[in-house]
């Protein structure tokens, strides 16, 4: 999702000398393949957006997979970038790197000041390792590698898998299927009280290109909207946009995850960047994308 959004944005502003490989063409978890790609193609700038991602269910069930796969991807790409003279690299992390009970909104300085959320600890530790590797290379070797921490993302080419998706795409799929099947209720994990922030993925792509052009430094930069919504409020928004007429039921026996996740985006704002897509418009665009994927899958 993120990689395709960055490509769309780069092309829209006139870049056409892009080196692109799908996961089928290049397995980033295999060091030899990654090194061969970098030594042959010699890219000058790298956006490292590849990752194994998932929601609470997937992270809870497969923590070893999430840690191993993400560590391998990050270390292989960053290491190959250094050894092959990449001029600048942007590493995309996640807001889950911050402590579970960090002061809100979460500033970049909150990193490693407390315990992580248990349900996605493995993924968070992998992401922290990636940003720290960039930091250490900058300090030791004089590289220009920057780390960007986006909030929760959604938009075109999202993952709508019933077990492995994040909350917003999962809600889109669940309400759509309930509408199509005329089901009386839709069940949602937890209490609905956790607060979350959401950023449309094309806005993140715009921010990444802005930072690649305008920021150099060893400090992490948060990317978000600075606005939050409860899971309960989000569910109602998605329900209305999808057009589902039934009821919402909350399964309080299931985990909520982190109670609140709002990023402090003051550093990015001071650099001169602002998001453009509000949540309602973004969910409408995401639902249109979901429908187009569903139609293609049926053909």
Give each language-model segment a name:
Residues 5-13, 177-299:
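C-terminal substrate-binding subdomain of Rossmann-fold SDR/epimerase-dehydratase oxidoreductases
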Residues 11-36:
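Adenosine-cofactor binding site in Rossmann-like domains, unifying the SAM/SAH pocket
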Residues 31-71, 83:
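NAD(P)H-binding glycine-rich loop region in Rossmannoid oxidoreductase-like domains
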Residues 55-56, 91-107, 122-128, 139-140, ...:
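Conserved catalytic-site region of short-chain dehydrogenase/reductase
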Residues 67, 71, 119-131, 161-169, ...:
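Short-chain dehydrogenase/reductase
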Residues 75-120, 146:
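Conserved Rossmann-fold NAD(P)-dependent oxidoreductase catalytic core, especially the SDR/UDP-sugar
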């Amino acid at each position: 999702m993120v990689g395709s959004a960055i490509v769309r944005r780069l092309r829209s502003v006139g870049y056409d000398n892009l080196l692109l490989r799908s996961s089928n063409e290049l397995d980033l978890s295999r060091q030899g393949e990654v090194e061969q790609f970098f030594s042959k193609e010699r890219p000058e700038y790298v956006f490292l957006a590849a990752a194994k991602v998932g929601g609470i269910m997937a992270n809870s069930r497969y923590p070893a997979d999430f840690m191993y796969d993400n560590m391998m991807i990050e270390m292989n790409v960053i290491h190959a970038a250094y050894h092959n003279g990449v001029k600048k690299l942007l590493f995309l992390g996640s807001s889950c790197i911050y402590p579970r009970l960090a002061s809100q909104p979460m500033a970049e300085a909150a990193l490693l000041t407390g315990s992580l959320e248990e349900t996605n600890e493995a993924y968070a530790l992998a992401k922290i390792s990636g940003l720290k590797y960039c930091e250490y290379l900058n300090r030791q070797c004089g590289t220009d590698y920057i780390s960007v921490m986006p909030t929760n993302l959604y938009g075109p080419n999202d993952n709508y898998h019933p077990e492995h998706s994040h909350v917003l795409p999962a809600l889109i799929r669940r309400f759509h299927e309930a509408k199509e099947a005329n089901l009386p209720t839709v069940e949602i994990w937890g209490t609905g009280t956790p607060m979350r922030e959401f950023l449309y993925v094309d806005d993140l792509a715009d921010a990444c290109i802005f930072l690649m052009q305008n920021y150099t430094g060893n400090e992490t930069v948060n990317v978000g909207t600075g606005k939050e919504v409860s899971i309960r409020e989000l569910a109602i928004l998605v329900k209305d946009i999808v057009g589902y007429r039934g009821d919402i039921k909350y399964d309080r026996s299931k985990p909520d995850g982190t109670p609140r996740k709002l990023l402090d985006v003051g550093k990015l704002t001071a650099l001169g960047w602002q998001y453009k897509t509000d949540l309602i418009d973004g969910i409408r665009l995401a639902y249109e994308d979901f429908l187009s994927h569903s139609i293609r899958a049926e053909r």
